[in-house]
Structure formats: C-alpha cells, structure tokens
Amino acid sequence: MLARGCRWVLILAVVLLFAVAPAISQPDKADPLPSWNDTTPKKAINDFVAKVTKEGSPDFVPVADRVAVFDNDGTLWCEHPMYVQLAFALDRVKALAPKHPEWRTTEPFKSVLDGNLKGVAASGEKGLAELIMGTHAGMTVDEFEVTVKDWLATAEHPRFRRPYTECVYQPMLELLAYLRANGFKTFIVSGGGVEFMRPFTARVYGVPPEQVVGSTIKTKYVLRDGKPVLMRLPEIDFIDDKAGKPVCIHKFIGRRPVMAFGNSAGDFEMLEYTTTNNHRGFGLFVHHTDAEREYAYDRKTEFGHLDKGLDEAPKRGWVVVDMKKEWKVIYPFQK
C-alpha cells in the first residue's frame, strides 16, 4: 500500500498532467458548440447534422458513411507566422548543424543558420524540400516520432508563448467532439507530414493515428542489428495537398466524405470532392479575420493562401466562418 504522502504526490502529478495537457472537448448536450456565436455557420452545422442523422429524413446518412475530414494547419491549429512543421525543420537544422559543417555554405541551410528567413523563402519549393529531407530523413520512424514529441514538449509559439499543441482552435475541438457524438468518424487530411502529426493528434484532437492522412516521404524495411526497422529515406513519396487530397482520401480512407473543413487553397479540391457526394455534402472554410486574437490573412499570404475558395463558396453553398465574428474564443487558453 502506498504511504499517504506518496499517494498525495501521485494525485498531484495526475492533476498537473491534466492541467498542462489540452483537454479533448466533450459536447454539451444543451449546446455542443458553446464557443460559436449563434450566427449562420453554427446554424448551418447544426441543421446539417440534424438532417443527416435523422432516420427517415431524405438526407439521412448511415453511420458507416458518416466521414468528416479536416485540414490541420490553419483549420485546427495556428499556421502563422509559419507552418509548425517548418518551425520544427528550422530548429532541426540548428540542432544538426554541428554534424553538417557543409551547411554553413549551402543554401537553404546557410540562410537558416544565419536567421535569414527571406533567404529560406527565396529557395522556393526545392529549397524547402531539401530542408525537409535534410532534417526528417536518415532515421527510423520510431526515432522520428521521439524527435517530434521531444520538440513539441518544449517548443512554443513565438507570439502566444504557449506550446504549439495549445494553439488549437477551441471551436473546432468542440466541432470534432460534436460530430463524433453524432456517429461521424473524424479524419485529418493535411498537407503536413503524416508522421509529424500522428504523435499528437490523438491527445490533442481525439483523432487516432490511423485516421490521419498527410504528406509522406519514402520508407524502407531494413534489418538493423538483427532487428527489423523502417528507415525514413530522403525522397518525397506523396504531397497531400490540393488535388492530392481527394486522391489520398480515396486511397487511405476508402469512403467519400460527407463533411469537409479547410481554410486555404490547398483544401479547395477536398471540399469540391466532398460536396459532389451521392449523399448531401457540407463544406466549410475557416477565414482568418481576427488580427487581435489570432491573425488576419487570406489572399496575400505565404501560409494559408485563400482566394478561389472565398470567391466560389457562395456559388457552391459552402460555409465561410469569419473567425472574428463567429467565434467567441479562439484558443482554449483564452476562455
């Protein structure tokens, strides 16, 4: 039996654990979306869910077909001032630099080490791919998972001074929980690296790793010291963005979604694919309009560019969420 003092230490440890970890929202029966103002988007979500879950309704969708897909960057968590995975890659360059003296004179690594983000951006997609390959490959999948978890445990958003996993959108956490409570299976379909996201999605969003779809690099089965491991190779396998998203949905989920949520041009095809379903379909864009509580951006930004979606949404019956107007709070720590 534990001594009384030991029991209190254990209880305190548990309390502290749950105090620092973002809680997965549980839907309130009276109002499952309490952080949403009572405006058009909230009503549209509630009306759609009611119609597709009511047996006998012409829009009824069987539980097996209730698939909802969510982008991650800018839809579930903050993507400014840069994608979180890019911040991870930049930190990895600095950590690995002593083992790579050639990086001091090789772009885009030189710009990273010099703190020249404009130089990094100028390297374009080719340079960013080199950064990813140089910092994400050459290790086993298990080693990479540990690296990601260790980084997320200490890295903070530069503006909010909170762990990145706390810079998640409270209204979207409520939405995820609400849909699951109504028989939906929730998936993340993101341009981010699938093995970067899987270490935290279950804890933060309630989405298990097998329901996370993302961009991938190639892996290879090898024996290391007589034990089988999967090695991450410095080669791109698939980019899960734009037209690649419906392809990945078909390939890895195997069902056409009923609901799709995004925030950028990279999500357009996913919403288009979802809302031309045989079932009634629902598409929603999160529009970043709140510079005070978060960030305001759309057509002119490097991260989360949104133009065609804004123009096409009214014509296609897609919902556009104005963050400033529609959300009572943005982050859990702002409640």
Enumerate the language-model features and the residues they cover:
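Bacterial N-terminal signal peptides that target proteins for export
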Residues: 1-10
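Bacterial N-terminal signal peptides
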Residues: 9-20
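N-terminal carbohydrate-binding/catalytic regions of secreted carbohydrate-active enzymes
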Residues: 48-67, 80-81
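Short, solvent-exposed loop/turn and secondary-structure capping segments
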Residues: 79-82, 87-90, 199-200, 273
